[in-house]
Structures are given as structure tokens and as C-alpha cells.
């Protein structure tokens, strides 16, 4: 097989052993498609690798190329920044759950918010200590919930980057979606596991007779009841991606998908807190304010509720619908000049209703029996992201100096709104009266207060009556009068990857200019706040090849990010965050006879004008302040192959991320894990009756304390740390002439229980059995 790097090419996608399940309906679709398309090509076909794509011919857990660092296909060792690649084979082996779990084995990432939180955005993550809200899909901002079935690989870029406009300084997550494979065919698989977990999944590529058109059909169905008192979720995903070669030098592409989730909002009402008077300064009383914390109301994670706890009931709902559309066009003017356009639209509509007993407080009427009041909420959020990107790549030489120049423009528009949020609380006299009126008219019995003794005595609160969504919409008051927010961002950027000294040294220089407009409107369409601004940012990095196997790299950059915070006194929007970052380190490949590769990096990031605004469940208001933050640390990533059939991936990070300045000084940043270690390994039997059997597993160890909230009043709500083990096995065989792969995954093998992120716990031990058939 020949491998060429050409300006325009057919994307190559890796066919691993699919672990998720495909729907029977889509099998029929694929079978129908296969009558219209015929396989074309032989094993000697030339594979052309596009400068805009990153699929590799080789498989495995390691990767040698990236597109996220420079905007074009580039060797990882030539990029002057830390980039971690999660390959499709690693995803197949390690992933049971969702996109969140796919990132568990990156040592610099932790989840910071709960899933199903009643907002249109996915879970936020902490990267190098900073909360990250910018999830990219194929290099384009506007990340909503990403179904695992869409993902071909994930690239995590550490630190700010001039390519991506309003990026967070800790880094960004770029999801590379699946495109049609070079060869026709695919897989269908089925699975079943604990907690009534079932699923079906299909992934099939069809190609036209002349090989110009490729279509990839994707489908995924999952359903499970969960392991909590009331839990469970059903997911249905349908997707189609395609490429078409208009000419030898011009190719179009698209992807369309719809992902629907229904179930109980368990992660929205899973865990709880308690207020315990604490003598923080050791003076013998609990009446002082110590570093912003009132001793009488010191708040901690709950100490008495069982791990199966959930305060929602069967009358609560979670319903989310996410739609994706991406179109692209590439054209090659010559071997050294390529242009690409990509347009993306993401729409989401999410509705959730929940009953929550959030914080248990001291009970003056019955000391020792803490009490919590109910919060019954219905909310709907809708978000639309539309992004258009145009990139022009030009390669040229000036004497002995080689250039890879990227010129780009990105237009991003976001509209966020929805039908609002409505709530009725048992602890509010006026709202309790409305609940009592609904009860009188319907015969429902509502629980206004929950006591510690109720939990300890096993009261079945999950069987309680709750207001229906229509009752909350009809009788509750809307929490706020905001209608929609609009964000319009224009980004111009230029990067040049310059190679000197016979390619022994390369410098990456970049500049980015951003113009943004933000506006929010009240109900009725009246504009209540607006903000305009612009900024120019720079990036400068370099890679020096010490020898063929070891490279030194360094990178400095600043970043600029609009934010949604408003001054509570004036209502005016607060200006953007700014940040400066520096990192340096070593990248090494093929050490010890080609067995060891990896990287080590040190970094420092400073971020200013940070709106620290977190919902406070005690007051049901937002605590807000403007601070400065700083994070520094060391990261190590290793890929080791003791033998050809044994792979080990290990990573470690030490991160010291705290608030600096005059407000909340010394508070650790939310989700920042001081020490985090991950390891994943697999071993393939290469001889004997079990030839082909692949076994492995991984461990994730996080050392606390891990801050759960970003405000000072909740500084004692922390996770002490945890260790989780996961196992898997795959066995390929033949049934007649049909290739079949059997699999088993055990997630959280020791059934460890911990608070994964703010008010959300991890999943209980899960067994998943799967069978996959090649089509």
C-alpha cells in the first residue's frame, strides 16, 4: 500500500472493533444503499491524505499527526504545544458511557458540572485548571452535546491558540467526526449489560462505482434504567456523512445528524449538600466570618444520604433534541495552495423538570435532624450556533526557508434563549401556597420539606407526587425576565509555520484579530444590555530538533474571550477575559528501540477579568465577583510498547490553580486536581487457541482536595479524591464465513463511589457485553 500526502484526497477513516450498538433499522438502510453502490479498489490503492484531515493509516492508541494545533495536517512533533490525541481504537476499547467519560484518561481534564443540568451546553470541563466552555467540532466552535457515535477521534490542545478566536486559556477540545471510509463496509453490533442496559449500533460506508461518492450511515440506540432510585435514559442517534469528488482537485463534504435523549433528570437532582456550623478559626464559637465563609452556615458535601439517592421522581422529565449540519468544500489550486470552506449549524432544544432537595440545614425545632425544602422547577433552553470558516493554506520557500502559511476568517453567531425557568419552592410561603392550591385541586400530595431522619429511615421519596410541567408553567413565576442573548464574533487569523536549518528548527507565529458584539433582550424584545469590543492576540512558538528522537518546544500566547457576566448593580455586560500563557517541554519518539514515545511540559497561565458567578443553592441567587486566576503545572504523557502486541498509555499532571488578586485569594479553581494519574493498557494474544484475544484496562487516580464550586462561600465543598478501575476484553472469531467480535467492558470495577463533579456522582459498577459483526 502506498501512502501519499497530496493537496486533496479521500479521507481515510480507521475501522476499529465497534463497541456500541447499531439499530436494525439502519442495517436495512445500509443494505439498501449497498445495492446502489459497489466496492471499488484493491489493497494496492493509493491513500491520499488531505492537509485538512487527520486520519492515519496505522491504528493503535498513539498518534503522530494533528490538525488542531496548526489548522492543517501536521506532525505532532512539529507543533510547539502540548496536544493529546484520543484515537478511535482507544475510544472503542475504553468507552462505555458518553462523551464525558471519553476524556477521563486525559490527566489534565476534569469534569466541573453535572450532566442534564437543564441547559443547552454540554458538561463543562477544567483543562489545566480553567473551566472550558469551547467544545469544537472539526475545528469549528459551537459545541453542543456530541454523541459518541459521531466521534472518530478527539484532540485536546493545551493552552491558548490563535486559530480558534475566543478560546479558553487552558486549552480546547476538538472533536473530529466520522467521514466515509476509503473501503465499503462496516459493522453492526448489539450489547446488553447491568441495569437493563441494551443497545444497537450501526456504522456502514457505501461507495459509488467510480469511487467519487462516499456515504457513511451512522445509527445508535441505547437504553438503561440506571442504578439510582429513579434513573434511566434512552438515546436515539441517526447520522449521515458524505464526501463527493467534483473534480480531481475539488471535494465537497457534509454531515447531518439528530440526537434525542429522554429520561429522568437524575444528574440534575442526584447529590445534596449540608450546612454544619463549624469553628473555622478555633476561637470556640461559630459566629464569625472567616475568609468569606460564615461559620454558622459552613457548607459541605452531604454525609448521610445513600449513594442511590435522587430527589427527582417519575413525574419529572428530561428531554433533549440536538441537530447537527456541517457542509464543506475543498479545492486545490496546486500542490502548495489549498483552500477550504466549512459551515456548521448546531441547534438544541432541551426541557427538564425536577424536584430538588438541595441543601440540608440545621433545624432549630429538632436539633440533629437537618431539614431541606423542595425546589420544583421546569425550564426550557434553546441554543443555535452558526459558524462559517474559510481557510487558505499556501506553501512556499524563501531561499532555504520553508513556509506553511494559513490565512483564515471565521464568522460565529450564537443565539441562546428558550421558554425560561419556572419554580415553586416549599420553603417560600407564597410559592408553598400555590403548591397547596394545586394539591387541593388535583389531589396530589407534595412534600415541602425533607428531613434527615426521613432519609435514614428509608422514606421512599422517589414515589412522591410532584407538580407536572404544565402546572409549573401555568402557576409558577418565571425566575428572570431575560429572553435571549446574542453573540456575533468575527475572527481574522494568520499563522506561519516556518522551517529553518534543513527543518531542524521550525517557528510557529500567529496573529488573531477579533471583533465581537453581545446583546441581551428582555421579554418583549427590549434590549437591556449590549457590548462591543475587539482585540488582537499573538502566538509565538518553536520546535528545535535536538536529534532525530528528541525535540524541545516552547510556546507563548495571549487570549481574549467574551463572557456573559453582567454587573448586578448596573446591568451592564462585563468586558472580556484576557489571559497570557507560556509553556515549554520535550517531545520524544522511538526511544529504547522504538518502544517509548511521549512528552513532558511545564506551563504557567494567568487570566484576568474573570467573572466568578456560581449559582448558590442556599440562597437560590448567583454569587458574583471579578477576580484574577493563575495556574501552573507539569504534565507527562508516555506511550510504551514493551512488545509489538502490548500497548501502555500513561499520563500524570501536577496542577496548582488558584484565585489571585484581592477577591477570594487562594481559592483553588473549580475542578483543578492537584495530582492526577491515568494509565490504560491492552495486550493481544498472538498465538495459540486464543489468538487475537485483546485484554486490558485502565486506572484513573485523582488526588484531592478538588474544589466543586468556584465561589468562596462554598470553598469547603470538595472531593477528597478517588481511584477508579476499568477493564475490557475483545475476542475476534469466525462463525462460518462471518467475522464476529465478542466484547466485555467492566466500568468502575471496584464499585468505588465519589462525587465526580459539582452535585453529580460517578456511575456504579457497570458490566456491558457486546457482539459486533462485520458487514
Regions from the PLM with identified roles:
Residues 38-39, 377, 381, 393, ...:
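Conserved C-terminal beta-signal and adjacent last beta-strands/turns
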Residues 504-507, 604-606, 625-709, 750:
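Gram-negative outer-membrane beta-barrel transporters
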Residues 245-247, 383, 402-421, 426-432, ...:
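Structural signature of Gram-negative outer-membrane beta-barrels, strongest in the C-terminal barrel
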Residues 50-183, 584:
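Acidic, small-polar-rich N-terminal luminal/periplasmic segments of exported/outer-membrane proteins
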Residues 332, 338-344, 348-356, 576-653, ...:
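Membrane-embedded beta-barrel scaffold of Gram-negative outer-membrane proteins
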Residues 222, 226, 241-245, 249-332, ...:
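Acidic/polar loop-and-plug regions of large Gram-negative outer-membrane beta-barrel proteins
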Residues 150-152, 162-238, 246-250, 323, ...:
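Outer-membrane beta-barrel translocator/receptor signature
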Residues 203-229, 233-241, 245, 322-332, ...:
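Surface-exposed extracellular loop regions of Gram-negative outer-membrane beta-barrel proteins
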